[in-house]
């Protein structure tokens, strides 16, 4: 069964983690417009050359070019590969364009899954995280400190780092931006009855189980 899904969630909700698990466990492919754009420009595809010319001129890439990128990538993958859309669509016009792109290839949008988070809890989750500067092992001030203070459990390094944008102001600004971006498209998909919300603050395995159940891929 080929699935076409949109996975929504603000930064820090665990969207990337869940998309990666679906890729690893079910062979699904995550379609990130940013990644596709960079890949097309690097490969010098017809759409990529169009996009490069626009960006070199300091202009925003049009919906038509983004739609072309998605169509190009779906054609590369073929009809039997399930896909996860990330960062697209963000407007009603893009949602309409996506319908056309999928329909032209015998596909339909099956599910829109939103990872819902509590804003205060998300601030706590993000502002407390840090990682080993050498191996990248992740830690948290409240939930996962190194077993021996200031020494990485995995590689023994004493050097740790935090992302410069892991601060409360940035997190709350991103939440506002996320709501603004999803506001135009959620009602469209809710009217079709294909939106399901999952508690993004639950443990990773539980979130994955909920998504698997929605998609019918559990077990």
Curated annotation (Swiss-Prot):
UniProt KW Acyltransferase keyword: no
GO terms for MF: adenylate kinase activity; ATP binding; zinc ion binding
Residues engaged in binding AMP: 33, 38, 59-61, 87-90, 94, 162, 174
Entry-linked PROSITE patterns: ADENYLATE_KINASE (PS00113)
Keyword terms: ATP-binding, Cytoplasm, Kinase, Metal-binding, Nucleotide biosynthesis, Nucleotide-binding, Transferase, Zinc
Enzyme Commission designation: 2.7.4.3
Positions bound to ATP: 12-17, 129, 202
Classification via NCBIfam families: adk, PRK00279.1-3, PRK14527.1, PRK14532.1
Record-linked HAMAP family: Adenylate_kinase_Adk
Similarity remark: Belongs to the adenylate kinase family.
Protein name per its UniProtKB record: Adenylate kinase
Species name: Sphingopyxis alaskensis (strain DSM 13593 / LMG 18877 / RB2256) (Sphingomonas alaskensis)
């Amino acid at each position: 069964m080929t699935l076409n899904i949109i996975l929504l969630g603000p930064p820090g909700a665990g969207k990337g983690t869940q998309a990666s698990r679906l890729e690893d466990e079910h062979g699904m492919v995550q379609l990130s417009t940013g990644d596709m754009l960079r890949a097309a420009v690097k490969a010098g595809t017809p759409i990529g050359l169009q996009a490069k010319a626009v960006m070199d001129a300091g202009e925003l890439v049009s919906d038509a070019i983004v739609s072309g990128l998605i169509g190009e990538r779906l054609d590369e993958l073929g009809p039997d590969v399930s896909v996860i859309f990330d960062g697209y669509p963000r407007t009603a016009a893009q949602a309409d364009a996506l319908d056309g792109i999928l329909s032209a290839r015998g596909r339909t949008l099956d599910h829109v899954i939103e990872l819902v988070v509590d804003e205060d809890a998300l601030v706590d989750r993000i502002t407390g995280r840090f990682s080993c500067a050498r191996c990248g092992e992740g830690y948290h001030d409240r939930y996962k400190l190194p077993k021996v203070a200031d020494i990485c459990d995995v590689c023994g390094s004493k050097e740790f780092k935090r992302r410069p944008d892991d601060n409360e102001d940035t997190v709350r600004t991103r939440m506002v931006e996320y709501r603004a971006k999803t506001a135009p498209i959620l009602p469209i998909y809710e009217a079709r009855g294909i939106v399901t919300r999952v508690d993004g603050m639950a443990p990773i395995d539980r979130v994955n189980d909920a998504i698997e159940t929605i998609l019918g891929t559990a077990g």
